């Protein structure tokens, strides 16, 4: 381990320390405010959504994370196959946190929009261009809903940034 890194790890329910007098003064805050340790964004999103045993929370953005928790006694020594994360205390103290989801979600929509919009780059006036862009995915969604599912149609997988679940593999593409 590099000498400048810490040798201990802490779960997200512990504090790293307290706000120093210098920073309290600079920020206009009282001294002694707790400073949190680092935590995973999706895990803290689940906390904000009131995750609890038996409740699945879905955090959606560039990717998606499906977060659940279970008591240690319920999990025992089992490791859940296919998910990308199972960590003691990663979401709530005293519980095992489970994470699954998609490596690509919102960024697929951004990429798709960019791919479809390249022809619009020469339209003068940002307002007209924006109006077309705003309606594009809405119209494509409407048309897709009218299509009948087919087992011999084109398949697109959400593996643009690798696969988070099932069986995480960040090198797979589809």
Q: How should these model regions be labeled?
A:
Residues 1, 10-174:
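Active-site core segments that coordinate phosphate-bearing ligands/cofactors
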